[in-house]
């Protein structure tokens, strides 16, 4: 029972997923701090007039309540930054490595098929010449005698 569970956990996909979750969590914290420290203050500076608190990115809904689109814009930028970095640092290299492995496997299969086909052709040629099939055929009996007569077309 535990051996099956161990095999399940040791598969490449589950280990890759665990690593991705840990790295993603750490990276999300880094990008969130970057967005909170740098991007959000820039958006707030551009979006909200500090004296009047009026902005196209802030909608007052009555009383002291307002819908602040600055926060939504910061979260969208945060998401885009995480998605871009994960794509370029994880997904793209992983797919390249995976395709490279598939290409090597394809070449190995192709070479194996070529060897089988060449062996079949060799055996068919040997059968049509009346010689036994196989790699170590005595070729002295199979070579034609040279024709030293002049050719008819000359």
Curated annotation (Swiss-Prot):
- Does Secreted appear among the keywords? no
Q: Which SUPFAM superfamilies has this protein been placed in?
A: Gated mechanosensitive channel (SSF81330)
Describe its membrane topology: Multi-pass membrane protein
Region described as Disordered: spans on this chain = 129-154
Q: Which domain of life is it from?
A: Bacteria
Keyword Lipid biosynthesis listed? The answer is: no
Please provide, alphabetically and separated by semicolons, the GO molecular function terms listed in this UniProt record: mechanosensitive monoatomic ion channel activity
Print the keywords alphabetically: Cell membrane, Ion channel, Ion transport, Membrane, Transmembrane, Transmembrane helix, Transport
Gene Ontology cellular component?
A: plasma membrane
- Main subcellular localisation: membrane
Localization per Swiss-Prot or TrEMBL: Cell membrane
Q: Give TM regions.
A: 12-32, 71-91
Q: Which Pfam families match?
A: MscL (PF01741)
Family label: Belongs to the MscL family.
Subunit note: Homopentamer.
Q: What does this protein do?
A: Channel that opens in response to stretch forces in the membrane lipid bilayer. May participate in the regulation of osmotic pressure changes within the cell.
Question: What name appears for this protein in its UniProt entry?
Answer: Large-conductance mechanosensitive channel
- Gene expressing this chain: mscL
């Amino acid at each position: 029972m535990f051996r099956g569970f161990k095999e399940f956990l040791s598969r490449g996909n589950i280990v890759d997923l665990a690593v991705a979750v840990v790295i993603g969590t750490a990276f999300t914290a880094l990008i969130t701090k970057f967005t909170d420290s740098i991007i959000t203050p820039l958006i707030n500076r551009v979006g909200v007039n500090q004296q009047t608190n009026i902005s196209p990115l802030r909608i007052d809904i009555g009383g002291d309540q307002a819908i602040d689109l600055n926060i939504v814009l910061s979260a969208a930028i945060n998401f885009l930054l995480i998605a871009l970095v994960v794509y370029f640092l994880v997904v793209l290299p992983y797919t390249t490595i995976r395709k490279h492995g598939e290409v090597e496997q394809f070449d190995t299969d192709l070479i194996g098929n070529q060897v089988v086909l060449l062996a079949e052709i060799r055996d068919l040629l040997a059968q049509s010449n009346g010689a036994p099939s196989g790699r170590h055929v005595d070729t002295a009996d199979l070579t034609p005698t040279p024709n030293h007569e002049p050719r008819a077309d000359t």
